[in-house]
Amino acid sequence: NPLASPDVIGITSGASAAAVLFLWLGGVTGTSLLLAPVAMGGAFVVALGITALAWQKGISPARLVLVGVGLAAGLTAVTTLLLVLSPDATAMNAYIWLTGSLYASQWHDVTALAPWLMVCWPLALIKLRHLDAQSMGEDMALGLGSALQGHRLLFLMLAVALAGSAVAYAGAVGFIGLIAPHMARRLVNSGHTGLLPIAALIGALILLYADWVGRVAFIPRDLPAGIFVAGIGAPFFVYLLYRLRRELG
């Protein structure tokens, strides 16, 4: 589905809601080391909820997106309510994380992310041929021997693990997961084995560029990278909706 991305289907919203709830319950002091695991746990809980609600003799990509959009809206409302009820210091700390920024990132964050990448990335690359088969349609995938629902569930969990870990340490930077794959498809006319690394590289470059602009364009102010990414991603999302409507007639 061209509209499916972690922020659209609610994975990012789940991580955000869990992080803000944690800050609201525990305050600001001493929470930085636990914030990332809590956010990652929130992403997995939401993913399980989406899977359960969207399951009807298997997972339908269209149904998955619809359920995810609904959950994302509800979780955004919960997050907003928690921010309103939070003390000013807690709300400010949560706001910085919610907008997405590399400002407080340290090398120990890279060390914490490494195990997720070392496990999830090779597994994703090994299984990508099944994603190529599924992109040709359900009947073709079944004919080629792909376990349709099992692999869909596996790819969903891998996506949650990779996206959730990134959100946990960089904050809720929206639309990168939507923009990068579409840009990669324009550059790489091949299967997912070549597409995935290029999309990951493009996503990283977008985030680094947005972070650089936020640091140097408004000196002495330091604006979060998520603001600039959202400024590009929101119009791009509208464009995808328009293009999808035309394709569907």
Tell where the protein language model's regions lie, with residue ranges.
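Alpha-helical transmembrane segments in inner-membrane proteins
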Residues: 1-249
